Amino acid sequence: MNNIRIYAFFWMIVLLTVSCYEDKGNYDYHPINEVKISGIKEDPYEILRWDTLKIPVTLENSLNEKAKLIYAWYLDQKKIAETEDLCYVVSDKAKKYQARMEVTLPEDDSVRFFADFEVQVFSPYSKGLLLLSDYEDYPEVSFMSTLNNPTNKIMRDVYSLENKRELKGRPLAIEQSDGWSYGGTVFVHTSASSHQLDPVLFKEIALFDENSFTGPAQEYDMVYCRFEDAITEFGGAIGKDGIIYPKQARQNRYMASSLKPIHVEGDAERLVDYRLSPMLLNTRNSTLGYDNLSGRFMYFMNSYDIPSYDENQYDEVRISQTYIGLPCLGWGKNMSGGTYQFSSLFYDPVTDRAALARAHSAFGKLAGKDSLVFLSGHHLAEGSVMAVNSGINWLYYSDGGRQLYVLNLSDPDFKFPSIPFECALPDNCRITMLKVSVDNLALFVGVETDRPEKYKGDVYKINAKDGTILEHYQRFGGTPVDMVEKKSVEYDVEE
């Protein structure tokens, strides 16, 4: 019995030995040529649509520097190239893509080496400067990209280019909404209509015209229009008839127009007429205007007690106690005390009198007895324009020609009401637009030149504190009216 066990154990050892020997012969160990990919950035590549994306790479082989390799480049899993270096005309939609460069060994396609990265595709209109100008009595929109545009190439008349029709009326304003109220869309306002444009393609997605009123269609002739104010998603327009047409975000029509004449707060039996300067400061269900008939601020609101066509209709007004008596030239936001306050400039070209409301609330109440200052040494004139820099509390204004002046709104004594703000603008120009940059560090100055050519409008970007010219954009458009620093909006767009 023991012999049988020993015999069985012997043959088991023999079989195992033979098996190990044969198994060893089945494995064929060959070193693999490993490929290291370098030259691809960690940060996303930013590229304008229709531009060429070029990415040169360096490949290091562990065994054979002359090894034949197979290359592939992918954009969201779509193969876009089969070359070692990428040279690709980006025709893809504007959005962020996950990309990959992949290297395969021809003798074994299961062995792959790759490098992942991101590509952010912007439309030609993703980010830059949008200028609304008056070109031979017609509105025109020009755009200059600030992405990969070293020569400051300007695209003119982009509304007509993308929508195959022209704007009509007089140019009033251009603005870009925030992401919450309108999704970053662009608005172009003229006296004849307002146009809501897709922020990626500049295609018109909504039109506000004579059919956009609450009630029956009527003549559309505006002297002022903005749909988004500094502190709210409410906006509005002022018609040539002097009536206010409120506008709320995400509504495709104007709300009911303001009563004219209108009831006075606290005395519903009393009605007053008004003639507003072309500007509004909108808050929720209310707006501040300036009445040139009474020479005072008027705060328009809904009383909820007076029967009206629309629950948001302005049917009551609060008249400011402060008498100013001069037409309002403009206003802007300042940050006195860290809260929202506003500064307004008044000027009457007939009498050459000027005044400054250094700080007032959104309701028209002046902040202190010294807030209203009548300017004796001013340089305002017919055609003057103004802007407020909320970062440093300066008010800039022009003299109707090429000279700039500044008012220091934070000066407690206000000893120097008009300080020349030196800037080396050419002699043959007239300032028609002032716009403070989003970061408050620069001032965009739009000028009309006397050049005998088609596009006479230039824009200068100057240092907000010392007037040094930072950039000069020649032939930006017609006579500059308004400008917006367009920000990019990242989302996919159906085309």
Can you say where each PLM-predicted feature lies in the sequence?
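Acidic/polar, low-complexity intrinsically disordered N-terminal segments immediately downstream
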Residues: 21-162, 436-440, 448-495
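Short glycine/acidic-enriched loop and turn motifs that connect beta-strands
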Residues: 135-139, 193-195, 243-244, 294, ...
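Signature of short aromatic-glycine-proline-rich micro-motifs recurring in repeat-based ectodomains
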Residues: 168-177, 184, 223-224, 276-277, ...
